[in-house]
């Protein structure tokens, strides 16, 4: 696992952040899930796979899986929520999530089938195949794919998108269209549904790459969400956008407004230095070629200066 993946997993695993993602994505910002009501689950998923005619046990690892309690109208409801972190499009994500969820459901069936060995003879006969009794229910499983990227999520979000276009409609109609939930920053219409630094992440990644430095500076200069950002979130923003902002070590919170100003000033200073060096080289070339009379014009006229750069091979 890369450093960036490790940072994102640690960030999302935090109960406060995890609850915020669940409330923001599933409940549109309503605070129905509390951090203290989350319970870490084993994220190892085991399944069988045929390899060269041999049945082998395979393991897959979710990024994060937690048991979630939903508190509503004095009632508690339960669900399992997994979060998968992605920094790039994964075109097989639908199949991967479908496998994870299916394994979780089968684990529940296996657990329930072993739960009550004292069931009546009638119950044992009626459930002898699966061990799963009539009337029993499963805890819902939801997987949220959190995309830490500056572009649009371009991968399929449903099983039908993975199937050939040439399939007859009659066949497609018989195949359940398994869909996944993707949190993509550029698609977040209302960042206020998030109450933690996840909001700053969605805003920053929606602006994009370091090439959009002026937009990024404007965002962070004017948005109070960036006055105090979780240092892990700041690190994620910095890595994904490749901005090169200096994140102070051993600080829980980072003032990204100040950090981006320093970053912007350094870029300007670097650009000025490079520009001065380049122009000095141009002046030298113009003098050597007997074109010194146009030096002042090159200094005053940006269009003419660009022509001179091109003429003397500095473009």
Where are these regions (language model features)?
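Elongated, amphipathic alpha-helical interaction scaffolds
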Residues: 1-315
């Amino acid at each position: 696992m890369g450093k960036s993946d490790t940072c994102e997993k640690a960030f999302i695993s935090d109960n406060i952040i995890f609850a915020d993602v669940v409330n923001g994505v599933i409940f549109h910002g309503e605070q129905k899930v509390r951090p203290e009501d989350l319970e870490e689950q084993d994220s190892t998923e085991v399944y069988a796979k045929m390899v060269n005619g041999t049945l082998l046990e395979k393991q897959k690892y979710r990024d994060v899986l937690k048991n979630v309690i939903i508190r509503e109208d004095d009632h508690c409801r339960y669900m399992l929520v997994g979060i998968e972190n992605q920094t790039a499009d994964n075109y097989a994500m639908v199949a991967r999530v479908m496998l994870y969820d299916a394994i979780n459901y089968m684990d529940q069936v296996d657990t329930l089938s072993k739960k009550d060995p004292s069931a009546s003879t009638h119950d044992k006969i009626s459930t002898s195949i699966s061990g799963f009794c009539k009337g029993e229910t499963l805890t819902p499983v939801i997987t949220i794919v959190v995309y830490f990227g500056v572009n649009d999520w371009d991968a399929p979000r449903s099983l039908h998108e993975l199937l050939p276009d040439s399939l007859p409609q009659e066949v497609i109609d018989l195949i359940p269209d398994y869909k996944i939930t993707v949190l993509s920053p550029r698609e977040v219409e209302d960042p206020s549904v998030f109450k933690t630094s996840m909001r700053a992440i969605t805003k920053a990644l929606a602006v994009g790459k370091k090439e959009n430095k002026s937009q990024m500076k404007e965002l962070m200069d004017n948005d109070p969400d960036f006055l105090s950002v979780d240092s892990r979130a700041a690190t994620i923003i910095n890595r994904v956008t490749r901005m090169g902002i200096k994140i102070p070590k051993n600080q829980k919170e980072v003032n990204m407004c100040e950090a981006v100003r320093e970053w912007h000033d350094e870029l300007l200073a670097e650009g000025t230095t490079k520009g001065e060096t380049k122009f000095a080289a141009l002046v030298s070339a113009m003098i050597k070629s007997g074109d010194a009379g146009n030096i002042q014009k090159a200094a005053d006229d940006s269009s003419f200066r660009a022509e001179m750069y091109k003429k003397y091979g500095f473009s």
